[in-house]
Amino acid sequence: MPPPTAQFMGPTQAGQNESQNQSSGEAGEQNQEHGQGPTPILNQSQPASSQPQHQQQRNESISYYTNFNQPRYSTDASINSFLNISDNVPVTSTGGPSSGGAYSNLPRLSTSSTHQPPDLSQIGRGFSIVNNLFPQQQQLQNQHRQQQQQQQQQSHQQPPFKTPSFSTGLTGSSSQYQFLPRNDNTSQPPSKRNSVYLGPNDGPDFEFFSMQQSQQPQFQPSSRRESNSMRPPLLIPAATTKSQSNGTNNSGNMNTNADYESFFNTGTNNSNSNQNPYFLSSRNNSLKFNPEDFDFQFKRRNSFVRGTLDHSSQNAFIPESRLNSLSVNNKANGDPVADNVTNNMKGKSNEVDNDDGNDSSNNNNNNNNNNNNENNNDNNNDNNDNSINSATSTNIPNQEDHSLASTDTTSNSRKDLKEIEQRLRKHLNDEDNYSSAISRPLDKNDVIEGSEGLNKHIDESGMQPNIIKKRKKDDSTVYVKNEMPRTDPPMSKDNSTSAEGAAMANFSGKEPPIPDISSVSDDATNLIGATKVDQLMLIIQARKKGFTEKVNTTQDGDLLFNQTMDILPPKSELVGGVEKPKGTQNTRAVKKHECPYCHRLFSQATHLEVHVRSHIGYKPFVCDYCGKRFTQGGNLRTHERLHTGEKPYSCDICDKKFSRKGNLAAHLVTHQKLKPFVCKLENCNKTFTQLGNMKAHQNRFHKETLNALTAKLAEMNPSENIPLEERQLLEYFASIYKNSNRGIKGRGKGVGTKKSTISSPENHPASTILNPNTNANNAIANDSENNGNPEGNIDSSSNSNPGSHSMISPTQKDMGTLQSQFIQNNFNNSVNSSNPSNQPIINYNYTTLPHSRLGSSSSSNTNNNNSNFSVGAAPGVLMAPTTNNDFSFNLDQSNDNERSQQEQVRFKNINYKS
């Protein structure tokens, strides 16, 4: 291959080329103003005959070692789409230049009859004027054909995410340019060659990001230079169409939020007809997301992104917690900045419900708006403008029907929560007025009653809709979500040295308060006798305590009894829970903190503090989903897993997941093929892995048998004998269902919401209560003066000597001796006795401990004379004289007499890490 030869031009030709370069430079600058970038200059060669050139070979020149005339591989056809090369001269009718206009010097790729195909190898990166010093050689035809074939393939089959350039143009008119007039005179940088350009017809290529066809803009700039500059995302909470519709504020200055207002206000007509709300808030080449793109299944209802991208809303979404803080907290603190923000937000709608009693507050809000030069023509007496309009509210997006609760309701609820905390402190510190200091649960009256009584009902529309849907129908407590700030809870796990704990620690050795019936929530009471098994266990527990009165039943097997009868367990025992396993004295800590209600002992003051909450109904932890309250934070977290679907516990064998650790433990039994629970009703002998499954089985398939056993045991005469089989069956029920009727939510459909089926005789006038024992003991139990005594103790009017009736602890060693002495004596002739003081009252080892103010030393009650000794009992338990009729069957488990009193009191299973 011979070395290339360098060719030089004469002075005349050099001057022509210099003038041509200057003119082409001016044309390039002109094209640069129209968004085309620098236009490449082609050295169109003239015939050799018209322009004679002086050629001279210089082998020692640098051109001897330089390859200028070979094709440039850097401008390969694979990167042609990135180069600013036009395929043809634009021919448009809407302002584009014609073929003979100022843009006729653009290079062409297509062949014509008058011009030869240009050499594209010298156009690209590293373009230099040195290339024009040498004559061009003919380009190979095969390379040109290859470029044409590749361009045809690109025009017919474009990839979904293409890299278009100015050579391809818009989709549908790839061979034309569109030069549109500029709308502004601001100096902006030129467009980049490799920027992604999305035209209005590029929707099919970007189906995931494409918008609706009805919302396609009719106007689209030719490049990014025609759009406004990119600004960082900004949320404008107080933009209104009244004051900013023309893009100017009251002072006459340009409004900087006009672009963002046009982004959210799709229906407003701006002064500029070419302005499009979808493409003016940012650069035209950026990707826009439509709210329908996020309309998938498991989205959040109050999504922050969805509220921002929703074009139907009049403003950006404001988080509810932030909105509450602006409307309540900052307003109360008197912050002038917060007041201005609140007044701006209330320009079109206030956060106060439309009520006749709130006209003065609405007028004040309108006056504040007049001071801020907004809504100057508002009528102070127009309540419709002051009410919250769900269609035109500028504060809250209404696609999910969110609305704010009334400020009065929020303040009233917060006031009620403070009153509960004050009542708790007063209750724990006061020792004289026990009955007045008892706290009661938060009911509807507490939430509804305000300081002036303006609001007589709670507007359900002001509450969160998801709370209303998931709330139980029979729930007697109304809770409003996020009314109390979660930053300052009434009680927390770190508040171990609080005033409540210190006050409860001072209860040792003092008289505890008497818990009122109304002070305990009815949730635990409704669980008593919920099923047939529970009703049978209720009468078994009553007979176990020594209750011998006859109780009538209905045709359906429901129990009928008076409130004075001691069938129902005391309120202090309706705390639920499962007893912890027994331990030794060395492994368990000394329990020195005593509960003033049930006299249970705890090793730590914080344990006692949590335990007392269950007695007084104080539940500071609220579920944000359904409004249910809990006494412990751990129980709340476990409950919230039902809403969130979280299941952190998984089985190692089958990988099944559970939300509770106890459910996992019950599931592991199924893999071990163990079924410890056996149904003994009617010789069924069906085995079960869980007790709840057997209970549901018995309530469904052995309902008649349970009704027969309940009726027989309820109407049994003390003189009758119990057959051996029935006694064993009763002992079987008493052993496996020992935690029944203690306020624990059991298994089965509708157990948690079902009211107790036990009714009183007043509701059934046709039924009569047969009292075979009309002695003085029953007179004491049915005495009208004794009804006010929640403990059911002996009436003081029946005996002038209160010291003659003393109580014996159920954990004392001589309890078995007293029972044996009592049973061995013959009391057949004392049924009609008129001396109630001689009738013994025995406590059959029930769970609660005696009150210290009613008891005395048990050493004085060890007299063997039956007429001189009288023992105490559990609250309201009266023991009628019995005969030797085998009725005194033992349903209690064996107790270790060597254990101390502190060890025998066990507390429920509490998650103390909450």
Curated annotation (Swiss-Prot):
> Where are the annotated segments for Polyglutamine domain?
136-158
Name the SUPFAM superfamilies on file: beta-beta-alpha zinc fingers (SSF57667)
Query: Residue ranges under compositional bias (Polar residues)?
Result: 13-34, 107-116, 164-194, 391-412, 754-770
Question: Which residue ranges are recorded for the region named Polyasparagine domain?
Answer: 362-386
**Biased amino acid composition, Low complexity:** 44-56, 138-158, 206-222, 245-275, 359-390, 771-782, 796-809, 856-868
Region ranges (Disordered): 1-63, 93-124, 138-275, 326-415, 743-812, 853-877
- Tell me the compartments it is located in: Nucleus; Cytoplasm, Cytosol
What results from gene inactivation? Leads to a defect in the division of the nucleus. Reduces the transcriptional induction of CLN3 by glucose.
Gene Ontology cellular component terms for the protein in this record: cytosol; nucleus
Q: Where are the zinc fingers (C2H2-type)?
A: 593-615, 621-643, 649-671, 677-702
Q: Which domain of life is it from?
A: Eukaryota
* Modified residue annotations for Phosphoserine: S61, S286, S325
One GO molecular function term? RNA polymerase II cis-regulatory region sequence-specific DNA binding
Checking PROSITE patterns in the record gives: ZINC_FINGER_C2H2_1, ZINC_FINGER_C2H2_2
Q: Name one GO biological process term.
A: cellular response to carbohydrate stimulus
Recount the UniProt induction comment for this entry. Expression inceases under non-fermentable growth conditions.
Fetch the InterPro entries from UniProt: Znf_C2H2_sf, Znf_C2H2_type
One of its Pfam families is: zf-C2H2
Q: What is its main location?
A: nucleus
Q: Which UniProt keywords apply?
A: Amyloid, Cytoplasm, DNA-binding, Metal-binding, Nucleus, Phosphoprotein, Prion, Repeat, Transcription, Transcription regulation, Zinc, Zinc-finger
The UniProt function text for this chain reads:
Transcription factor involved in the diauxic shift. In the presence of glucose, activates carbon and energy metabolism genes, and in te presence of glycerol-lactate, activates genes needed for cell wall maintenance. Binds to DNA elements with the sequence AAAAGAAA (A4GA3), a motif enriched in the promoters of AZF1-sensitive genes. Required for glucose induction of CLN3 transcription. Also required for proper FLO11 expression. May also function as a corepressor.
Q: What else is known?
A: Presentwith 556 molecules/cell in log phase SD medium.
What does the record say about domains?
A: The polyglutamine (polyQ) domain is required for transcription factor activity.
- The protein in question is named Transcription factor AZF1
Q: Which organism is it from?
A: Saccharomyces cerevisiae (strain ATCC 204508 / S288c)
Q: What is the lineage of its organism?
A: Eukaryota, Fungi, Dikarya, Ascomycota, Saccharomycotina
- Gene name of the record: AZF1
